[in-house]
Design a protein with these regions (language model features):
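Membrane-proximal extracellular/periplasmic loop immediately following the first transmembrane helix
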Residues: 37-105, 215-220
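Membrane-helix entry/capping segments
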Residues: 3-4, 11, 15, 243-283, ...
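Short cytosolic juxtamembrane segments of multi-pass membrane proteins
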Residues: 390-407
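Mid-to-C-terminal secondary-structure elements
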Residues: 123-137, 148-271
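Transmembrane alpha-helical interface segments in multi-pass membrane proteins
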Residues: 18-29, 293, 308-354, 369, ...
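Short amphipathic beta-strand/extended segments in non-transmembrane regions
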Residues: 61-62, 77-137, 251-255
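A hydrophobic alpha-helix feature that marks transmembrane segments and, especially
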Residues: 282-310, 389
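Short, strongly hydrophobic transmembrane alpha-helices
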Residues: 16-45
Length: 407
């Protein structure tokens, strides 16, 4: 019996190639976009090296400095503010100050090399868990002495030194020469907080003007909590520090709004008023519903075209349940084929993103669990889009069906 259903289903698919193509395209595209989006999400917010403790790492990414005249400035904080009001916090296990990553140009044997550079303190290597391939991190002593030492990633090591060991060799960064003390695995650019090609001590910057920057700067402060239970205590202690701020120029700015957050919460607060997870959930539901509505319309048109077939089968004794089951099997089979195409498509899209270097050092992988969830949803929506019109048409009188009855 099932074999006959499958034979009929494949005959229908081949006879109505356009409807089959549209249905498969809608199912495959929906799954591909869903899986790729989840892979990107996981790459940004998931616990991956060196940000393996994302659930208890908080960062002051931005501050909002407000003046008495209603003027305000929003962006990364200055080093002076973070050094004075986050470094002394006692609740965190560790506090690290580090700059945003900025591009710098170097030359090697006359070849121009663009490198992302990040200035960090010694605590940075405690907060984040980098995989050292050679050497190790620079120390507090290096930071105190403004030593020109650098940690670089493996790609930068290959660009400057080929396959030879980089340890102890000199590399030009930001028009200064640094001695390489460590080589780490590449960090994807999507790891916004820790990403760079090279990391050097903050104190080794060419200009010391950064020490006077207060509300306007290019620095973050990352706090490692001892446990998740300490996060509310960190927030409370930081609020206490904000209440005691001594403003350099109260006539210009007399209030600062800031909060140490996870990256997910920071993006949620700034872009979605704290509702990022809700916004993403709504977007996913809408994204899945649109192809469903499209499939319903396609199925209604397809079933209407088969009204005469339904009429003939009913005239020869086919009951409503048999007809509905036929359409259900067709829809499930179509969804499974679409899922297989999506599986291949996901691998292809993720491979292209990785191979083209569109996202530096990204290694996006197929999340099978998310793919299976998406496939189950696709099967559910496939059933939803096919059962109702099939059931309505199966209820028609044979004569009415032969006349092309309306649903």
């Amino acid at each position: 019996m099932l074999r006959n259903y499958l034979k009929v289903a494949f005959k229908v698919f081949l006879r109505r190639k356009f409807f089959t193509f549209i249905s498969l395209f809608g199912i495959a595209l929906t799954l591909i976009v869903l899986v790729v989006a989840v892979s990107l999400w996981d790459h940004v917010f998931g616990p991956h090296p060196p940000e393996t403790r994302a659930d208890r790492v908080l960062t002051v990414y931005f501050i909002n400095a407000i003046g008495p005249a209603g003027n305000h400035t929003f962006g990364p904080a200055g080093y002076a503010f973070l050094d004075r009001y986050t470094r002394p916090l006692k609740t965190p296990e560790s506090v690290s100050l580090h700059s945003v990553f900025l591009p710098t140009v170097s030359y090697r044997n006359g070849v121009k090399i663009k490198t992302w550079l990040k200035n960090v303190d010694a605590e940075f290597w405690r907060v984040f868990e980098f995989n050292f391939l050679e050497g190790g991190p620079f120390t507090k002593e290096d930071e105190k002495n403004a030593s020109r030492v650098a940690v670089i990633n493996e790609t930068t090591s290959r660009r400057f030194f080929g396959g030879a060991s980089a340890i102890g060799k000199t590399i030009e960064l930001d028009r200064q020469n640094f001695r390489v003390v460590g080589v780490v695995s590449d960090v994807p650019m999507l790891r916004f907080t820790s990403f760079s090609d090279a990391w050097t001590p903050i104190s080794s910057r060419r200009s010391q003007m950064y020490k006077r920057e207060f509300e306007n700067g290019m620095f973050f402060s990352t706090l490692l909590a001892k446990s998740r239970a300490d996060i509310p205590k960190i927030h409370e202690e930081f609020r206490g520090m904000l209440a005691r701020i001594e403003y350099p120029d109260p006539k210009l700015y007399n209030k600062i709004v800031a909060r140490p957050n996870t990256l997910l919460d920071a993006v949620s607060d700034e872009l979605f008023m704290g509702g990022l997870k809700t916004a993403v959930l709504v977007a996913i539901v809408l994204f899945l519903c649109l192809p469903t509505i499209n499939l319903i319309n396609i199925n209604v048109s397809r079933i209407r075209e088969r009204a005469s077939e339904i009429g003939v089968r009913k005239a020869f004794g086919a009951d409503s349940g048999t007809l509905v089951l036929q359409f259900v099997i067709e829809n499930v089979l179509l969804t499974v084929i679409g899922g297989l195409l999506a599986f291949v498509g996901c691998h292809l899209v993720l491979w292209l993103i990785n191979a083209t270097g569109w996202i530096p050092y990204a290694h996006l992988a197929l999340n099978l669990r998310i793919f299976l969830y998406g496939l189950i949803l696709a099967v559910f929506f496939g059933l939803l889009s096919g059962v109702y019109p099939a059931w309505k048409m199966s209820q028609l009188h044979p004569v009415q069906a032969l006349r092309g009855g309306e649903l």
